[in-house]
């Protein structure tokens, strides 16, 4: 499940002109522009936070508590993802997307590289922040019997997600039984 960018107005404060709104749609547009500029692979998976495609099927009404929480969390999120066969140079292209986002005033923070398995699978995660939003840019390459790549840019509005109780966040993240 993906969670991401949000529900706040993102207005400026103080005397002078207000900063333009930075909301879910703006975050999504910046993600998509960075993906396209970097040349990341085309994804047939739905993005989160962009305009609803004309003629799309409405989402079903949530029937469980977890589904209701997921529906609430969607308004806090903007995301793009690719899951599929490996594409040459995609990790470097993710780095280019991060550079493009930094050019849009996202501030790059922590960078982690983690070994996933003994077959050479790794995960790269770069954290970015902008105006109350946190984004995780991730690239995962798995080298096992089914070789695949997962690439995602996932932004979440902090104030929007803070509206969830600790118990609701655990349920969203699948930790309810463990915590």
Where are these regions (language model features)?
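Bacterial signal peptide processing site
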Residues: 7-11
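Compositionally biased P/S/T/G-rich terminal and signal peptide-adjacent segments
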Residues: 18-79, 177
């Amino acid at each position: 499940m993906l969670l991401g960018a949000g529900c706040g107005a993102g207005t400026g404060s103080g005397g002078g002109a207000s900063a333009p709104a930075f909301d879910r749609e703006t975050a999504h547009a910046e993600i998509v522009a960075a993906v396209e500029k970097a040349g990341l692979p085309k994804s047939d998976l739905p993005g989160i936070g962009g305009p609803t495609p004309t003629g799309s099927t409405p989402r079903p009404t949530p029937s469980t508590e977890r589904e209701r929480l997921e529906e609430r969390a969607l308004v806090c999120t903007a995301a793009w993802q690719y899951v599929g066969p490996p594409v040459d140079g995609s990790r470097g292209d993710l780095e280019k997307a991060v550079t493009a986002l930094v050019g849009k005033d996202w501030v790059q923070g922590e960078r982690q590289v983690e070994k996933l398995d003994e077959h050479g699978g790794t995960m790269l995660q770069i954290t970015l922040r902008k105006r109350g939003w946190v984004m995780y840019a991730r690239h995962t390459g798995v080298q096992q019997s089914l070789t695949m790549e997962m690439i995602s840019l996932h932004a979440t509005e902090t104030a929007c997600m803070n509206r969830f109780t600790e118990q609701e966040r655990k349920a969203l993240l699948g930790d309810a039984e463990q915590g």
